[in-house]
Amino acid sequence: MPVCYLKQKRMINKQLITRRFSRAVESYNREAVAQKQIAYRMSDMLNHYLPRPCGRILEIGSGTGFLTRRLMETLHPEKLVLNDICQEMSSCFTDLLGSGQATFLAGDAESLPFPKGQDLIVSCSALQWFVSPELFFERCNTLLKQKGYFAFTTFGRDNLKEVASVTGSGLHYRSLEELEEALRIHYEIVTVSYTHLRAHET
């Protein structure tokens, strides 16, 4: 089945992204309201579909741990590998890392070598920063066990569209149809959800 690997309209500066997120570690939990909502909804969905304990989990783009903490509480993984492009994010997991419950791999998930044999690969609010999510989907398939799960959330084309229209800059967001086309090559799609979220708490 053919697939179109889409080229970014604008290059993504990973070094700039790393610097900006590194500076935001202390304020992230306060500012990332939408990301927190998304992580909690993802946790609820995973809790519905996945067996427990889940075995080996790889989380891409862990951030400060919105999803990580829920995974520990609900899926009880035997081994948890956390990844974020910012090394500074590891400071949010000193308890998990110190106890040996998790390991942390800092770096660009599109090129970083990850351990194979995962029962679940999960990512919340990170794939919009990738140069080629399609190639990453393919790669994740090689890291999963047979009958393993790949679950992710990303932002759609309505995200910050007003800002992009004014500034003329922004990320190239895949449509739901484009994502599904790329996923069907390697995965059986269990469920898809598209939700509008509030960016700020009131």
Predicted regions and their residues:
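N-terminal, positively charged/glycine-rich alpha-helical extensions of SAM-dependent methyltransferases
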Residues: 5-26
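Conserved alpha-helix/loop element of class I SAM-dependent methyltransferases that forms part
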Residues: 34-53
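Class I SAM-dependent methyltransferase SAM/SAH-binding core
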Residues: 58-112
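A short acidic, Gly/Pro-enriched loop at the edge of an enzyme's catalytic core
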Residues: 110-121
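A short SAM/SAH-binding and catalytic strip from SAM-dependent methyltransferases
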Residues: 120-132
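A short glycine-rich, Lys/Arg-flanked "PGG" loop and its adjoining helix->strand segment in the class I
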Residues: 134-146
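Conserved class I S-adenosyl-L-methionine
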Residues: 149-178
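Conserved small/polar residues in nucleotide/adenosyl-binding loops
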Residues: 195-202
